[in-house]
Amino acid sequence: LSTATAPAVKKAVPPAVYVLAAGVFAMVTSEFTVAGLMPQLAEGLVTGIPQIGYLVTIFAVAMAVGGPLLTFALLKVPPKSALMTIFAIFLVGNVIAALATGYPMMVLARIISGAASQAFFGIAVSMGVQLVDERVRGRAVAVVMNGLMLGTLLGLPLAIFVGGRFGWQTAFWTISAITLGAAVLTLAFVSNPAAPAGGVEPAASTRSDLAVLREPQFLLALASSTLIIGATFSAFSFFTPILTEVTGFSVSLVPVLLLVYGAATLVGNLVVGRLADKHTISTLLFGTALNALFLTGFALFTGVPSLALAFMLGIGLVGVTMNPAMAVRIQRAGSTAPLVNTIHGSFITLGVIIGSAVGSALIPLHGLRAPVVLGIGLAVLAIAAISPALASPYLRRGAPDDASEGERESGPVPPACPS
């Protein structure tokens, strides 16, 4: 009787997972604040808009490179203690940003904050999925990723409003306060996941985590995540100039349009979170195919306001919202370990860099529609990288409902995923 009822209890996502989303909210708000306060930062730091733009790239590179290094350094630390350490590092980065009197000081602040945020994402996702039954991991990831969606939807406008009204320094002080609040909630309500039966030595665990880098299905999962996010950010990075210079919306209306886009990502994230566990690969394929379709429509009809807006909302529904399904695929092809999830996060960040950097390079040559066309190509490549996973029942659907607890929690993977 107990074995029949235990899994049902664990199907609920515990409050601790929602608390982890609060930390993600703080990190994402900080990540995008620089892009929203470029003119104020350029004036305050006595530099130009292009130099402030480089701060966005610096943050992304710090995430991609520094995040895994910081996670690796914290592997022997219990997950909750690791999160509290990261909160402290992230807080230092934002305080330095608030106190910055020149560009070099701000560069240092963004490097510290970027590395901390990526490490936090990886460990938070890892903890979130370890606190629930394997069959609802996608739902748990969606809850954690709600912090990302809400950071874009609410945190970024809040930081821009505060920074615009009271000075850009106040935006970073506000983020610091949010960080402290999230840290207190984590300290109070988040516990370390139960250790796996039999225990694993840290060195052996690290070797196992790194060994997945030789697994073809894991590498394909990394590639598809990079391409999915790259496709989305090829368009998202340039929504503002496209909507104002090509579509013809007023500059004052763009924040409202982006708010609606953010609401679409929130809805999409919730839907994908529900589908990600039982229909992992089909969700990725269908969602990415829709994204390619919406990107195509956006590229063709940017001059028609109603259609451009409709296709933009479509991109919001099926773009970054693939995160829960992407995470479930990565965990099945690899493991739920923090280092694995942080490496995955770094490849997602690589997608952001590819979409925005290559898109920027194409604009002088082919115009503002060119990055969107790039996104279409990346989405098609993503479909090609997702398709081989259809051969694995475990990657498609996970463990069967009648699998034992030991089978569900035994870790990485499936006989159907040969190396």
Question: Where are each of the predicted segments found?
Answer:
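Paired small-residue
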Residues: G93-I96, P104-S113, S306-G314
